[in-house]
Amino acid sequence: MNIKSLLLGSAAALVAASGAQAADAIVAPEPEAVEYVRVCDAYGAGYFYIPGTEICLRVHGYVRYDVKGGDDVYSGTDRNGWDKGARFALRVSTGSETELGTLKTFTELRFNYAANNSGVDGKYGNETSSGTVMEFAYIQLGGLRVGIDESEFHTFTGYLGDVINDDVISAGSYRTGKISYTFTGGNGFSAVIALEQGGDNDGGYTGTTNYHIDGYMPDVVGGLKYAGGWGSIAGVVAYDSVIEEWAAKVRGDVNITDQFSVWLQGAYSSAATPDQNYGQWGGDWAVWGGLKYQATQKAAFNLQAAHDDWGKTAVTANVAYELVPGFTVTPEVSYTKFGGEWKNTVAEDNAWGGIVRFQRSF
């Protein structure tokens, strides 16, 4: 074998080896297309599709800080200093379409902190507390709603006014477990029926009392409403299965102009005591009323007044000012006159209090 043949053979072997290695090389796959989050506008602003599903999700809530001074207009006691409180509310909403209608869920977690002046003699006068609560958690399919929510005795008529101290004269307890169905017609008419577990200690004069049912019989709430461009009128009736008494409210709202609206609400209870789930005002009856004036795009003035059968009168006014979109500052002044039978429950007949609320909503 001559040198030329040896060189040609070696070159052929190298070419063959290179071809074999090329055949065994790993080929990188083509990159997959990135699936960006899609906006879902079927249920309002802020929703997006959960990737890989047709479920729309929204994460929202608010951060709030309150500073209070003067008297406690609920109890009539002097605070003897500033009360401060903070809250972070985290809300999660979902929505999707099914063959039985729109399926929605709503949950709200509240993280609360309070630093209240104790009024005792000492170097430091503040008492602090903090806690977390699952405020709401419900499922809604069409008009059917099940879970933890606020009582239809409040929500169906539209709560009270747009003031912070709106329930100095309480119109019933709030949070409850419930099963409700709301019918909504195309002509402005709607109706609701609800079976409720009874309120917890979110409401009213009695403070820490829970008004849960003590057997299988639920509380029952029913209501009718008619709404139009002029305003609305609504009425609700509630039966308290624990004390076997009933309470009712009727409310009317009128839009005078696009900027100015007024409302009036009257209530009656068959049990003349605030120690109950629904009729938590003093005596047989109570009345609330108020107005709202949207002075500018940023500033709104709110006023509310209330009076009950036992002689308590409560008046509150505020100005809600939106400094920038999503950030609102609300200074508020409240006055309570404890007259009639309420005089025996408080140390002072008159209470003046103020609060400033800072809230960032998102």
UniProtKB/Swiss-Prot annotation:
It is found in: Cell outer membrane. Keywords: Cell outer membrane, Ion transport, Membrane, Porin, Signal, Transmembrane, Transmembrane beta strand, Transport. GO terms for biological process: monoatomic ion transport. The gene is omp2b. The pore formed by Omp2a is larger than the one formed by Omp2b. Omp2b pores have optimal permeability to allow growth and protection against harmful compounds. The larger pore formed by Omp2a may be advantageous for intracellular growth, when the bacterium is competing with the host cell for nutrients whose concentration is particularly low within the phagosome. Residues 1-22 form the signal peptide. This is Porin Omp2b. GO terms for molecular function: porin activity. One of its GO terms (cellular component) is pore complex. Its main location: membrane. Coiled coil: none annotated. Belongs to the alphaproteobacteria porin family. Pfam families: Porin_2. Consists of 16-stranded beta-barrel sheets, with large surface-exposed loops, that form a transmembrane pore at the center of each barrel. The pore is partially ocluded by a peptide loop that folds into the pore lumen. InterPro entries: Porin_alphabac. Homotrimer. It is a multi-pass membrane protein. Forms passive diffusion pores that allow small molecular weight hydrophilic materials across the outer membrane.
